């Protein structure tokens, strides 16, 4: 990540997420892997792109090379909107998350995302180089995201916003069928 504003925002996201991390961590869509490197526990960062210090590169985040119920915490920080097969990836996250584990998701609302990325594009080499791919969306509204997460087998246990309401976060648990 080459732009200073992007680094500041990433640092803010990490600051919001870190207190919720427990046990073994999997960061899906880890980018530069800064969250895992900032965590004091054991963690693995995975991404479909080699942004830098990624632990595991995968072709498809819906096919993770981990056993069932491996991780205590899974994070998707500013990631889910960039994943075209997001429902399958959420189901895969559910598979590798322990029954007592937590999923933590941060997301920018789509209207704010369009404005922000439009302003930022001239000085963000990563965004200009990579661009938006088919199936990616600018973000999710809170109701859209909560519905997607619920349909994928997750229940919200805590939610909030940060960056003056321009980003939202969700802490979720698995809905385990009886």
Task: Locate the predicted segments by residue.
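A short glycine-rich, Lys/Arg-flanked "PGG" loop and its adjoining helix->strand segment in the class I
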Residues: 87-99
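Conserved N-terminal segment of class I S-adenosyl-L-methionine
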Residues: 1-62, 160-169
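Acceptor-substrate binding/catalytic loop of class I
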Residues: 127-143
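Short catalytic micro-motifs in class I SAM-dependent methyltransferases
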Residues: 78-82
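A SAM-dependent methyltransferase catalytic signature shared across enzymes that methylate proteins
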Residues: 142-159, 176
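A conserved beta-strand element that flanks and buttresses the S-adenosyl-L-methionine
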Residues: 75
């Amino acid at each position: 990540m080459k732009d200073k504003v992007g680094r500041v925002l990433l640092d803010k996201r990490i600051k919001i997420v870190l207190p919720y991390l427990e046990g073994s961590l999997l960061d899906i869509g880890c980018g530069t892997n800064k969250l895992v490197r900032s965590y004091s526990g054991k963690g693995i960062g995975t991404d479909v792109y080699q942004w830098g210090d990624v632990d595991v590169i995968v072709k498809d985040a819906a096919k993770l090379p981990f056993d069932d119920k491996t991780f205590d915490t899974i994070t998707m920080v500013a990631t889910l909107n960039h994943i075209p097969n997001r429902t399958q990836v959420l189901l895969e996250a559910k598979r590798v998350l322990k029954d007592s584990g937590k999923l933590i998701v941060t997301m920018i609302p789509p209207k704010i995302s369009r404005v922000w990325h439009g302003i930022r594009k001239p000085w963000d080499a990563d965004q200009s180089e990579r661009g938006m791919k088919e199936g990616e969306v600018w973000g999710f509204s809170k109701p859209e995201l909560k519905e997607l997460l619920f349909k994928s087998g997750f229940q919200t246990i805590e939610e909030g916003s940060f960056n003056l309401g321009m980003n939202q976060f969700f802490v979720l648990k698995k809905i385990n069928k009886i």
